[in-house]
Structures are given as C-alpha cells and as structure tokens.
Amino acid sequence: MSSSLWLQCLQQLQEELPATEFSMWVRPLQAELNDNTLTLFAPNRFVLDWVRDKYLNSITRLLQEYCGNDIPNLRFEVGSRPVSAPKPAPTRTPADVAAESSAPAQLQARKPVHKTWDDDPQAIAAINHRSNMNPKHKFDNFVEGKSNQLGLAAARQVSDNPGAAYNPLFLYGGTGLGKTHLLHAVGNAIVDNNPNAKVVYMHSERFVQDMVKALQNNAIEEFKRYYRSVDALLIDDIQFFANKERSQEEFFHTFNALLEGNQQIILTSDRYPKEISGVEDRLKSRFGWGLTVAIEPPELETRVAILMKKAEDHQIHLADEVAFFIAKRLRSNVRELEGALNRVIANANFTGRPITIDFVREALRDLLALQEKLVTIDNIQKTVAEYYKIKVADLLSKRRSRSVARPRQLAMALAKELTNHSLPEIGDAFGGRDHTTVLHACRKIEQLREESHDIKEDYSNLIRTLSS
C-alpha cells in the first residue's frame, strides 16, 4: 500500500480545513492503493457518509493535481485497512528496466512509493494537528510597558514551564490591547522550545462551533479526545461562552482534564473573571485558580514606543514629536494606534510628502475630530459620577469625604490622560481648583493604581467606557 499519495492529500487538507474538523473526520481515514484504486477506510458508516458528502470533491481535486491523467479510482469502505504480508518483488527483465529509465521524469516523480502507513511516523505526526497560531506574533515584537508588564512576565514564565508556572493563566482587558498577541507569543515560544508540543489556539466561538457540530454528528468522543490531548490550549475571548450551557459543561470537563494532566491553559477575556455574566460560578472560580492579570490601555510612553516600533517595521522614519502627537491624541488601544499609523504611512506613500505634525493632522483629521468629540471633561465627569453613583455636582463641590474625593481625583486623572486640556483648564472645570490640586490628584491615582486592585480595576473600566 502506498502512504505517500494519501499523505500528500492529508497535508493539503490539513491546510484547508479547520483543525478540529480535520482531526475529527479526515485524520481517522486509512488508505490502501491497489490496482490503481485508492480505497479509503472509515471507522464507521456515519464517518464514511460524512466524508463522502463533504470532502469527496476536495479529495478528487487533490488526486487530479498530484496524479494528472494517472488518477486512481476512488472508493470508500467501512472498516480498517487489511494487513497483509509484503508481496515478493516481481522479477524484472532488462526490458522493464529500460522502459522505466526511458519514462518521462514527471511520470516517475508522480509514481507512488509503495510502503506501509507506519513506515513514515514523523510525517504522520506532522499532520496530526494544526496550531492556528500566527507566527508573526512573538515576544520579540511585543512592546512592553507598565500597562502590560506583569502580563508579559507571566506569559514568558508559562512559555518556559508550561503546565507548572501559572495554570490557568487568565489575561483580561479591553479590545486591542495585545492579549491575542501574547497568546500567540506563548504558543510560538512553547513550540520553539519543544517542536513536538501540541499547542492549539482558537477563539471561544470556534470551540462552541466544533462542539455543536460534534453533537449533531454523534462524534462527541472524538471532540473530547482532540481537546484533551493537547499540551497547551489557548482560548481567546472566553466571555463568548456566556449563556451557552452545553458548551460550558463540556469546557468544564475539558478544563479539569487538562489541569489534572498538567497541560497548560491560557484564557483571555474583556473583563475580570467574576464580572463575566452568563458563565457558571464553578467555571469562573476555576478561571482564577492560577494567575489572573489585567492588560491595561497603554500609557503615553508605551503608545509612543509602539508607534516607533511599527514605523521601524515599515522602514519609515517617524520623528519623536510626530509619534508623541499621535500617541497623545489616540489613547484607547494598540489596534487604533496601528490603524492610524498605517493610514499616515499610506498617505505619505501616495503623496510623497514628509511625515510631519501638520501632515498627520491632515491625514487623521476625521479620526482626531471624532476622538476630541467623544472624550471631553464634561463626558468624563458624567461617566465617573454615574459609575460611582454620585452626582456631577458632587465632583465640582468642596466636599472632601472619600466617597466623593476619590472619584473626583479619578476624574481629574482621566481628564489629564484622555484630553488635551492643561492642568489649569482641568482645575477650572472641577469647581475652579488650582492646577497643583489636579497634579496631586494625578499622582495620587497613579500611586493607588499600583497599590489597590479596586482602583486599578475602576480606572481600567472607566478608560474602556470612555474610549469605546
């Protein structure tokens, strides 16, 4: 039997199909090539019908591509490939040898090599799963700052010692802050350290879709085996499990099985585990068994560093003052920064003009106008007052009770971070306070964000609300 032809088909199908779909339906097939007939053996009638219905055209196309006019007949059977003793090689005459040597090289290259499936275990192992990881996302090109420092350090430790350092590792924060980049970076580093590691990255919705498909097709055991056999499971946006009870039930058992096997789990969400609504308490409790780390919006210095790094990747010189101008005005997330820089670079390429502050102001005029319109001191005051269930008048008053003073300090710090107003202007907007009061408030909040988890959470939540 020849494994090389079917192996070629498998390798290409793995590239074309989702990882779980390939593992569930295509990988279990066994193949035998005899008398120009390729027979595919399925473990049961259900799998046979499913493969023939869903993948026949793809398999036929690949056979045509690899064999040309010599395409073998294709048939399907239920069962296992028969194991037979190797046949003795036929006696070859000088004419046979001459005929083979004179055959076109292309046909010789296409001719299958007859050997058993198990003769090439490394090749088979190579197609057993697909990680879905983005090779471009590495630790080397992740820009570190105070906002993501702890998350990056934890991710590095997990990649060096998966299943033992922090398990699970739970990263949370707003959209576009680098959580997905860190997931891929961990996965890529694990594989770099151990090329045989089975690491799978996916969005939580993909897990749900795979489970639903498995239930519909009576293949839940294959589904379980696949997900519980990985060395590291990286799931993005776990909050999409909300209100999906059957998916939560299955993930609960998968989670337990992986932890018992010291297999690494890394999850991300847009909010703290206990704040995820629609998810069972037993799952939320398990999310916090390892290490939970917040990824916050990047501070000004990190935003500047991100812009400089991205410009360098594009081989574009970006002056410090230009990077500062963009970073000062676009504060919500990394994705927004990258999008703005891409637009600036594209405009510069189209027009041939140098990238100056005036050029950036023109290229991003609609984006900058929208940002200034969305985030105002008035809007900040209303949002903070609503968040703490007090009145805007309280923020402007002379009251010094902690229930009012702390929200007032937070609002001042947010005004400094999210607007272009000067300290005196911010002080005037808060009941005519002196600029030194605003400066003290900003420094106090910066200190509390380091010391108090609650203040850190409140600040991140307000930033996310105001920037969305």
From Swiss-Prot:
The keyword Glycosyltransferase does not apply. It holds the Pfam family Hda_lid. CDD domains: AAA, Bac_DnaA_C. GO terms for cellular component: cytoplasm; plasma membrane. It is found in: Cytoplasm. ATP binds at G176, G178, K179, T180. The keyword Cytoplasm applies. SMART domains: AAA, Bac_DnaA_C. Residues 84-131 are annotated as: Domain II. Residues 132-348 are annotated as: Domain III, AAA+ region. Keywords: ATP-binding, Cytoplasm, DNA replication, DNA-binding, Lipid-binding, Nucleotide-binding. Residues 349-468 are annotated as: Domain IV, binds dsDNA. GO terms for biological process: DNA replication initiation; regulation of DNA replication. Residues 1-84 are annotated as: Domain I, interacts with DnaA modulators. Oligomerizes as a right-handed, spiral filament on DNA at oriC. Plays an essential role in the initiation and regulation of chromosomal replication. ATP-DnaA binds to the origin of replication (oriC) to initiate formation of the DNA replication initiation complex once per cell cycle. Binds the DnaA box (a 9 base pair repeat at the origin) and separates the double-stranded (ds)DNA. Forms a right-handed helical filament on oriC DNA; dsDNA binds to the exterior of the filament while single-stranded (ss)DNA is stabiized in the filament's interior. Domain I is involved in oligomerization and binding regulators, domain II is flexibile and of varying length in different bacteria, domain III forms the AAA+ region, while domain IV binds dsDNA. This is Chromosomal replication initiator protein DnaA. It comes from Vibrio parahaemolyticus serotype O3:K6 (strain RIMD 2210633).
